[in-house]
Amino acid sequence: LAGDENGDFIRQLEHRISRLEGVLRLNKMITEFGGKIFATNGKKADFDATVEKCKEAGGSIATPRNPGENDAILYFVKYFNTYAYLGIKQSPIPGKFQLLDGAQLSYANWYSNEPSGKGEE
């Protein structure tokens, strides 16, 4: 596409994406924090299925790295009255946790005696 046509095409795409994001927000399917989009389909699934669905959508399972991201995830938990799987697993050191890729966990906001692995963390 040439100059002006290219700019018009980009503006049309931006407008369309903005409209789609608006619809998803209205349906409580996405929320945003810090430039990241957090999304859900609102369905219950097991951990492995959740990880796979996130990959299929071109993303990854949510891993809160600060209070704002934690709140974005909590938004879905409260709205759908459910729990959320996180991109965190138990480390080889009992009682310690790490990211799925093995990196050190730099943010946690657990309730007392959690996580317990019962979906109530």
Residue ranges, per PLM feature:
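Intrinsically disordered, low-complexity regulatory regions enriched in Ser/Pro/Gly/Thr
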Residues: 25, 29-33, 53-55, 77-80, ...
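Conserved beta-strand elements of beta-rich interaction domains across eukaryotes
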Residues: 38, 44, 67-68, 91-93, ...
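Conserved hydrophobic ligand-interaction patch in extracellular adhesion modules
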Residues: 47-88
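Surface-exposed ligand-recognition segments of extracellular binding domains, strongest
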Residues: 79, 83-121
